[in-house]
Amino acid sequence: MNISNIKIMLLGSGELGKEFIIAAQRLGIHTIAVDRYKNAPAMQVAHESYVIDMLNSDALEQLILAKNPTYIVPEIEAINTDSLVKLEAHNFNIIPCAKATKLTMDRQGIRALAVQQLNLQTSKFAFANSEQEYLDVIQSIGLPFVIKPVMSSSGKGQSIVKEHNEIKKAWDYAQNGSRGHAKGVIVEQFIDFDYEITLLTVRHKDGTSFCDPIGHIQKDGDYRFSWQPHTMPDTALAKSQEIAKEITDALGGYGVFGVELFIKGDEVFFNEVSPRPHDTGMVTLISQNINEFELHLRAIVGLPIPDIQTLQPSASAAILLEGDTANASICGIDKALADANVDIRIFSKKEIHGKRRMGVVLAKAQNTHIALETSKQALAHIHLTK
């Protein structure tokens, strides 16, 4: 196989895209990073970069036609997916495929596939496209419930509502956190689950492979900590893999899919799926023989996917910092790296207004509990320069 002539265009250039671009660069693949703002993380390591509104069909199609990439790899949901469907019909290779990108760009599309077509078990849910509809569906869902924008990323706009006086605030928060032009929400019955996992599922030319389950903690709908492997009963793991294969087969295409699942005893509830590497999967940068970004690349270009191994129990901690500056400077990295079992990725985002994920701490240990505590101790050293 000759991969030297491959050209990959990444649509969305955040921190996950940056690691994907690095994986491609290491194999000599030409990379193009695209986003709506200058100097996004992946742009800093790509051969070429372009700033466009990816929701604008004309701008998106003109750039793709001009650059003629071998593979078009979406990294975010805020993309004009109708354009991707159109381009795929003209023999452009959308990853994993235009259908998967379109269905997963909003929660309404993927729930329709999961529940109506595949009959997967989920929490009780309903969609609302106005505040009045939202108030109406609450009557059937009941408290407590989870509200999420139909289109958002990194937990933006998500909240758990436990009291009546939180209902209005949660609606407003969801509207502010919505991406693209969609303003609808999904209201889900809150499941008192035992734990939640991400099952990284790799569809490739030789079949489907699974990474070990990744446990994670979220706050305000956003990932804060993850660890691998997450120990779970064989029955629940088998059900999780069955669900993950079913949903990813229905979506189609090659690449890594982040399948989010709730586990309660031996019951497994489908939550969401992303047709790309997952933020909780950043732990694989230290835990696995082949990390999720390398797996995504290999699956896309047709390279072998050998046995995926968890080398050592590991954990990750998101570096979520708060401030108001256009020139962020991070301190404490030296203290965090004093531990030989700790590594760090800084995403090189300069602007921060409020809270923003600026990096990730990675830690390994003899078990996941110690790895998680080690990541938290290292995280405590890191802060913005005052």
From Swiss-Prot:
- Any GO BP annotation: 'de novo' IMP biosynthetic process
Instruction: List the GO molecular function terms.
Output: ATP binding; magnesium ion binding; phosphoribosylglycinamide formyltransferase 2 activity; phosphoribosylglycinamide formyltransferase activity
Q: Where does N(1)-(5-phospho-beta-D-ribosyl)glycinamide bind?
A: E15, L16, E75, D279, K349, R356, R357
Q: Which residues form the ATP-grasp domain?
A: 112-301
Instruction: Say yes or no: keyword DNA repair present.
Output: no
Show the catalytic activity: N(1)-(5-phospho-beta-D-ribosyl)glycinamide + formate + ATP = N(2)-formyl-N(1)-(5-phospho-beta-D-ribosyl)glycinamide + ADP + phosphate + H(+)
Q: What class of enzyme is it?
A: ligase
- In terms of superkingdom, the source organism counts as Bacteria
This protein's pathway reads:
Purine metabolism; IMP biosynthesis via de novo pathway; N(2)-formyl-N(1)-(5-phospho-D-ribosyl)glycinamide from N(1)-(5-phospho-D-ribosyl)glycinamide (formate route): step 1/1
Residues where ATP binds = R107, K148, S153, S154, G155, K156, G157, Q158, E188, Q189, F190, I191, E196
The entry's cellular-component GO terms read: cytosol
Under InterPro entries, the record lists:
ATP-grasp, ATP-grasp_carboxylate-amine, ATP_grasp_subdomain_1, PreATP-grasp_dom_sf, PurT, PurT/PurK_preATP-grasp, PurT_C, Rudment_hybrid_motif
Sorted UniProt keywords: ATP-binding, Ligase, Magnesium, Metal-binding, Nucleotide-binding, Purine biosynthesis
- Record's family? Belongs to the PurK/PurT family.
What function is annotated for this protein? Involved in the de novo purine biosynthesis. Catalyzes the transfer of formate to 5-phospho-ribosyl-glycinamide (GAR), producing 5-phospho-ribosyl-N-formylglycinamide (FGAR). Formate is provided by PurU via hydrolysis of 10-formyl-tetrahydrofolate.
Description of how the protein assembles with itself and partners: Homodimer.
Under the heading HAMAP family, the entry gives: PurT (MF_01643)
Q: What is this protein called?
A: Formate-dependent phosphoribosylglycinamide formyltransferase
Gene coding for it = purT
